[in-house]
C-alpha cells in the first residue's frame, strides 16, 4: 500500500511539481523516452500546469498536487530539484528533510516517521482466493 493511502486520514499530503528534471531541450534521459515522459522545459506557467495535469491524469495520481511558480520559489525554499521529501509539522516547522533524489530519496524514512507519530499501519496478509466451483479439481477415483 502507498504511504498516502495508509496515512491520508491522519496527515496532509502535497506534491509540488518544480522545474522539469530531464527536459527534451536540456538533459533528456533514455528512461524518459522509454516511459513516454518527454517534455521541453516549461517557459511559462501554462506549460508547467499542462505537464502537471498530464501527469496526474496519466498516472491517476491521488495526492493533492501543486505547481511551483516560474520564479521557482518552492524549489528555492526547499531545495526540491529534482525530487525531495519533506514533513512539515502542525506548527509549520520542518520535521523531516529527505535527501535529494533519486540517490538519497527514501520514502521508507517518511513512512517510519509517520508510523512513529501516528502508529504503524498493518495490512492483513492477503488470503489465497478460494477456487470457484468451475475451477475446483475433480475428485480422483480410487481404485
What are these regions (language model features)?
Residues 1-59:
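Structural microenvironment flanking redox-active thiols in thiol-disulfide oxidoreductases
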Residues 8-12, 60-64, 82-83, 90-91:
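Loop/turn elements at helix/coil->beta-strand transitions in domains of secreted/extracellular proteins
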Residues 16, 66-68:
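Conserved beta-strand termini and adjacent loop/short-helix elements that scaffold enzyme active sites
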Residues 32-36, 65, 72, 94:
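General secondary-structure edge motif
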Residues 42-43, 63, 70:
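Gly/Pro-rich cap/lid or specificity-loop segments adjacent to the active site
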Residues 52-55, 62-63, 122-130:
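C-terminal, non-catalytic tails of nucleotide-sugar-dependent glycosyltransferases
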Residues 69-143:
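Thiol-/selenol-based redox modules, centered on thioredoxin-like
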Amino acid at each position: 500500500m502507498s504511504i498516502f493511502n495508509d496515512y491520508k486520514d491522519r496527515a496532509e499530503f502535497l506534491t509540488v511539481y518544480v522545474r522539469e528534471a530531464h527536459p527534451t531541450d536540456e538533459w533528456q534521459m533514455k528512461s524518459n523516452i522509454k516511459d513516454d515522459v518527454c517534455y521541453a522545459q516549461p517557459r511559462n506557467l501554462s506549460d508547467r500546469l499542462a505537464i502537471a495535469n498530464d501527469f496526474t491524469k496519466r498516472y491517476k495520481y491521488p495526492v493533492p498536487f501543486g505547481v511551483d511558480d516560474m520564479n521557482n520559489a518552492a524549489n528555492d525554499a526547499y531545495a526540491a530539484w529534482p525530487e525531495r521529501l519533506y514533513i512539515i509539522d502542525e506548527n509549520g516547522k520542518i520535521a523531516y528533510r529527505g535527501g535529494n533524489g533519486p540517490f538519497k530519496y527514501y520514502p521508507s524514512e517518511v513512512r517510519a516517521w509517520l508510523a512513529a507519530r501516528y502508529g504503524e499501519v498493518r495490512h492483513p496478509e492477503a488470503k489465497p482466493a478460494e477456487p470457484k466451483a468451475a475451477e475446483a479439481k475433480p475428485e480422483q477415483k480410487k481404485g
